[in-house]
Amino acid sequence: MKFLDEAKVYVRSGDGGAGCVSFRREKFIEFGGPDGGDGGRGGDVWAECVEGLNTLIDYRYQQHFKAKKGEHGSGRNRAGAKGGDVVLKVPAGTQILAEDRETLVADLTRVGQRVLLARGGNGGFGNAYFTTSTNRAPRHANPGQEGQEHWLWLRLKLIADAGLVGLPNAGKSTFLATVTAAKPKIADYPFTTLHPGLGVVRVDTREFVLADIPGLIEGAHEGVGLGDRFLAHVERCRVLLHLVEGTSEDAGAAYRLVRAELEAYGHGLADKPEIVALSKADILDPERLEAQVASLEAACGRRPLVISAATRRGVPEALRALLAAMDRAQAEAAPEKAEAWQP
């Protein structure tokens, strides 16, 4: 399935149906009086978070969504039927923004969440509504109200517990394929990963979702390479696993480069808990490995993990470190319970 994480859509709710001008006509009833019914309300436009989706690709092929108009009222006090609704189905993690791309309309993070995007117009009153003590036969009715229309942006931010960051070819996709059932494209050239991927990690008796995004390079926040637009998909992660390629010239410099891009991007990414690991340890000789570990330790200020996704060296330790960091982050984010009132 192709991946799309941003789409622009036009939504319009249905117009309300017009009220009816009608009079009761029956045998032996000389003055039947007005019996025009009200118009039906126009259909609404909703957005609903559904299970089984992880892309907005459907909105590349259809951008206009219009609900049905309400039906007109008719005689014998019959009201018009309500217009049919339109529902935009989106994956969990979808943000809905106004046309200016800054005003947040809704943030759908749970399956089953619904938000009203455009309310249908009210139906007009029939002439029976306007009957008064001085006007027993009104000959006018209301037209229905017009529906609402908007241009909106849909922006997907994948929901994962932990995210992988690093330079291209740091081994992120290999790590994801090793610890989950995901099958990302893996090759020995930069930018093999062109869109984010998700996988479910099982550690002992627990599970969490891990996200892999395309690699960052120097100047990514200015649009160099694939840019930093995919960093939005790790904004919701509680913890980052920063992989640094062991075969790079200087592991410490590679680490600092990615950290600089995270800080330039903002949105709190640089402040998230981070597990640092030196990858591809299986192809380094002991002397070179120790030098890279020392360089990385000097850059990040703590002893990094040493892993190899190919041989699974250090992988269980990295996963357990992620779990522990997630537990700490969740405990810090949990609001303190207020003490119960006692007389």
UniProtKB/Swiss-Prot annotation:
Gene that this sequence comes from: obg
Subunit structure: Monomer.
GO molecular function (one): GTP binding
Protein name: GTPase Obg
HAMAP family per record: GTPase_Obg
Domain OBG-type G stretches: 160-327
Cited InterPro entries: G_OBG, GTP-bd, GTP-bd_Obg/CgtA, GTP1-OBG_CS, GTP1_OBG_dom, GTP1_OBG_dom_sf, OBG_GTPase, P-loop_NTPase
Binding-site positions, Mg(2+): 173, 193
Record-listed E.C. numbers: 3.6.5.-
Protein localization: Cytoplasm
Function summary: An essential GTPase which binds GTP, GDP and possibly (p)ppGpp with moderate affinity, with high nucleotide exchange rates and a fairly low GTP hydrolysis rate. Plays a role in control of the cell cycle, stress response, ribosome biogenesis and in those bacteria that undergo differentiation, in morphogenesis control.
